[in-house]
């Protein structure tokens, strides 16, 4: 099986959830990182310069044996099944994982759709509300979000919070997680995973602040 993950040269959770799933599962894949200039052409014509089709003209995109797959959730579940980070025969656990992917997406859309000058307002309002609800929903007992083993749910929340507290978003305090100890705990647990640390050392910029957990 030939697998290619297409995204920008940046460790954003929407792509890292797939990259890390494959890496943790020791699954060989091409980590294809394109420029913002090429992405402008993707938005216009729905394909890379090399001819690979990009469904919905959006990234990330996963190509499996010349079949292109779009959307973060679908890509994450496919990669998670390959690497045993998403259950194949346990529908309840799968649904529990899905809810964390969906809330991560909701929070991302909330931030990304807000102008920088309005982010202080959403931090005080809707973002704080969502983070409080998420924090209060977690029952960790020193384990990962859904079971004793890491899943794509954990990678999603870790990656999202790493982005929020990485100095890349104006108007949101870097210490936001001090008010949300359960979220902070799961992020710290994921952050200690040996394979994740291997990936960070291999691919992250040397000066990248990946999270203030």
Placement of each model-derived feature along the sequence:
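GST-like domain detector, emphasizing the conserved glutathione-binding G-site
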Residues: 1-131, 140, 145, 149
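Alpha-helical packing segments of well-folded alpha/beta enzyme cores
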Residues: 18, 126-130, 134, 160, ...
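Residue-level recognition of oxygen-bearing side chains
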Residues: 74, 182, 195
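GST superfamily/GST-like fold recognition
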Residues: 97, 145-184, 190, 200
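Short acidic/histidine-centered micro-motifs embedded in hydrophobic/aromatic stretches
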Residues: 100-103, 158, 202-206
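Secretory-pathway/luminal and periplasmic proteins that interact with or process carbohydrate-rich
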Residues: 106-110, 166, 212-213
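Acidic, Mg2+-coordinating catalytic module of metal-dependent nucleases/exonucleases
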Residues: 137
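C-terminal helix/juxtamembrane-tail motif
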Residues: 189, 194-213
């Amino acid at each position: 099986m030939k697998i290619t993950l297409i995204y920008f040269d940046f460790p954003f959770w929407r792509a890292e959830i797939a990259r890390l799933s494959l890496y943790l599962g020791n699954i060989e894949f091409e980590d294809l990182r394109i420029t913002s200039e090429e992405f402008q052409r993707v938005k216009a014509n729905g394909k890379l310069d090399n001819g690979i089709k990009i469904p919905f003209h959006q990234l990330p995109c996963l190509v499996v044996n010349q079949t292109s797959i779009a959307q973060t959730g679908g890509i994450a579940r496919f990669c998670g099944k390959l690497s045993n980070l998403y259950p194949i025969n346990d529908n309840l656990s799968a649904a529990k994982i899905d809810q964390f992917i969906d809330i991560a997406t909701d929070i991302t859309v909330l931030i990304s759709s807000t102008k920088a000058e309005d982010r202080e307002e959403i931090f005080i309002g809707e973002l704080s509300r969502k983070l409080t609800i998420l924090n209060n929903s977690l029952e960790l007992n020193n384990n990962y979000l859904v079971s004793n083993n890491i899943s794509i749910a954990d990678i999603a929340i870790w990656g999202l919070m790493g982005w929020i507290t990485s100095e890349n978003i104006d108007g949101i305090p870097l210490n936001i997680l001090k008010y949300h100890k359960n979220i902070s705990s799961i992020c710290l647990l994921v952050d200690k995973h040996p394979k994740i640390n291997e990936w960070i050392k291999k691919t992250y910029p040397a000066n990248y602040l990946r999270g203030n957990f």
